[in-house]
Amino acid sequence: MSHSPLFTSPPKSLCILRLSAVGDVCHALAVVQHIQRHWPQTKLTWIVGKTEMGLLSGIEGVELVPYDKKSGWKGVWNLWMFLKNNQFDALLNMQTAFRASIISLGIQAKYKIGFGKKRSREGQWVFVNRRVQDPETPHVLDGFMAFADYLGVPPAEMLSWHLAISDSDREYAKQFIDPTRKNLIISPCSSKAEKDWLVERYAEVANIAHQHNVNVIFCSSPAKRELEMVKKITALCDFQPVDASGKTS
């Protein structure tokens, strides 16, 4: 930490604004729970997308406020009304999308914190009064951890993710997992096809993992594009990986 921390004592309440997508929300969860471990008495409120809400449901000590982007201005207004009596010590706007910046206008917080110059996009800087320092490493998680660092939370030796997973879900997942060796789960599709990695490279990674006696599992949503992507990859594999595409949530 090369700057003075924003808080030298635990804040009473923080609001996290990260709506989507599932992968980014997973990274944000590690940061939120890291803050939670350091400041267990701080009230944490997380505004999250309706779809991503299903992933986070059941996590302890965090108030989840869902927002459906399909609800338009009515949804934004309803969100503002729901939070109108909340005065947060800080808002962590961890999403650069213009929609998130608009939502932030109706959130009452002394400090509204956004990304640094390198990562800020879509005019986010207009809607914040504090900006984190850009990390030297480019990974999404590093960008999110910069928010915890800016608040005054010490770095974590090792981050952890704790999701509320039901016993039935754990039992269902056992059919895909080999408990006698390491398991590699590959989810090759992003929300947009243009963001996807090359089919040949996924197959190459899978083949290398298999050569090291790793159980390779492919997963995806039931969407046609994603099922076809997995089919193309597995066709290039030198072995038969576990195909869980369209079978998990």
Spans of features found by a protein language model:
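Catalytic machinery of carbohydrate-active enzymes
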Residues: M1-S249
